């Protein structure tokens, strides 16, 4: 407990077979990267990293030792992944350097490295006329020159008149055009029947109305006659009853 305030630096080396294999892979990767960097002209050389663990307390528990070993294993795995990336990196870096050199030779001093290739653009498609842009800004469509013409310019003054007779300018050698068939002439009887048929068709409804009215009037007259007969019978019956009552009263008075 006396050495609690002291700080001790310890270098922990792998003791298991897996850790030794990882170290061998790291050494082989470092040699490959040095060879590739020397061939491509790059001065970047990976340096093996040592893991230094600083412990403030001299007495460490077993859990802390296990945690430190896990940290070392993750460090070795990270080194392996970095070595595998560095082996594939030189080819891509070389191609990017070639592209940058090509851009500098062409004299492009812009910051962006994007250069579209094999693209043919028509300069006329990049801008519009002032009238079209003005119409689009107002939400309108540019009119055609034909639409802007006046009514008299577009149509002749006599376009509504019927077609002229071409008989005056007809060439005598040309055959005349066929006319439509002429309707047959009707005789007097046919004409009279047609007229009557037309009259009947036109006067059919009023005739039917008059016939209906006549039937209705006849029915009303029959009803009136029946009602009159019934009334007469009732009056006769009442008169007979009165006579019978009067005669019976007189007969009774005479006997008494």
Swiss-Prot record:
Q: Main location per UniProt?
A: host cell
GO cellular component terms, alphabetically, are: host cell plasma membrane; membrane
Identify a single GO molecular function assigned to this protein.
SH3 domain binding
The UniProt annotation puts the region (CSKH/LBD2) at 146-155
Coiled-coil boundaries? none
Q: Which residues lie on this side of the membrane: Cytoplasmic?
A: 1-228
Entry superkingdom: Viruses
Record's compositionally biased regions (Low complexity): 27-42
- Ranges for the region named Disordered are 1-49, 162-183
Spell out which residues lie on the membrane's Extracellular side. Answer: 250-256
Q: Can you tell me where the transmembrane regions are?
A: 229-249
Question: What is the membrane topology listed in the Swiss-Prot or TrEMBL record?
Answer: Single-pass membrane protein
- Industrial and biotechnological uses noted in the record: Used in cell biology research to transform T-cell lymphocytes. Saimiriine herpesvirus 2 transforms T-cell lymphocytes, including human, to continuous growth in vitro. 2 viral proteins, Tip and StpC, are essential for this function.
Q: What is the effect of changing residue 151 to H?
A: Partial decrease of LCK binding
For bias kind Acidic residues, which ranges apply?
1-14
- Compositional bias, Pro residues, is annotated for 174-183
For the region SH3B/LBD1, give the residue spans: 174-183
Effect noted on mutating residue 151 to C: Partial decrease of LCK binding
Localization annotation: Host cell membrane
PTMs? Phosphorylation on Tyr-114 acts as a docking site for the recruitment of STATs 1 and 3.
> Where are stretches of biased composition, namely Basic and acidic residues?
15-26
Domain notes from UniProt: The SH3B/LBD1 (SH3-binding) region binds LCK SH3 domain and CSKH (C-terminal Src-related kinase homology) region binds the kinase domains of LCK. Both motif are required to activate LCK.
The entry's function note states: Plays a critical role in virus induced T-cell transformation. Binds to T-cell-specific tyrosine kinase LCK SH2 and SH3 domains, thereby activating its kinase activity. Once phosphorylated by host LCK, forms a complex with at least STAT 1 and 3, resulting on the phosphorylation of STAT3 and presumably STAT1, and their migration into the nucleus to induce transcription of target genes. Stimulates host ILF3/NF-AT-90 activity. Association with host NXF1/TAP transduces the signal up-regulating surface expression of adhesion molecules as well as activating NF-kappa-B activity.
Q: What does the record's miscellaneous section state?
A: In its host, LCK protein is inactivated, preventing T-cell transformation activity.
Q: Can you state the subunit structure given in the record?
A: Binds host LCK, human WDR48 and human NXF1/TAP. Forms a complex with activated LCK and STAT1 and STAT3.
Name recorded for this polypeptide: Tyrosine-protein kinase-interacting protein
Q: Which organism is it from?
A: Saimiriine herpesvirus 2 (strain 488) (SaHV-2)
């Amino acid at each position: 407990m006396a050495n609690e305030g002291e700080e001790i630096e310890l270098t922990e080396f792998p003791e298991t077979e897996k850790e030794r294999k990882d170290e061998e892979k790291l050494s082989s990767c470092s040699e490959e990267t040095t060879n590739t960097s020397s061939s491509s002209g790059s001065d970047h050389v990976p340096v093996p990293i040592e893991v230094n663990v600083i412990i403030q307390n001299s007495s460490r528990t077993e859990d802390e030792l296990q945690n430190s070993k896990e940290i070392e294993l993750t460090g070795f795995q990270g080194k392996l992944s970095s070595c595998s990336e560095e082996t594939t990196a030189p080819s891509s870096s070389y191609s990017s350097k070639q592209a940058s050199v090509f851009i500098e030779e062409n004299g492009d001093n812009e910051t962006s490295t994007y250069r579209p290739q094999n693209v043919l653009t028509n300069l006329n498609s990049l801008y519009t006329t002032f009238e079209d842009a003005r119409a689009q800004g107002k939400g309108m469509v540019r009119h055609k020159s034909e639409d802007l013409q006046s009514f008299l310019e577009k149509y002749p003054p006599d376009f509504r008149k019927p077609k002229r007779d071409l008989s005056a300018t007809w060439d005598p050698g040309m055959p005349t055009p066929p006319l439509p068939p002429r309707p047959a002439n009707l005789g007097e009887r046919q004409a009279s029947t047609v007229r009557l048929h037309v009259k009947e068709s036109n006067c059919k409804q009023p005739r039917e109305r008059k016939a209906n009215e006549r039937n209705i009037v006849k029915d009303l007259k029959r009803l009136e006659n029946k009602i009159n007969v019934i009334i007469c019978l009732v009056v006769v019956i009442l008169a007979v009853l009165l006579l019978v009552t009067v005669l019976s009263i007189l007969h009774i008075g005479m006997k008494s």
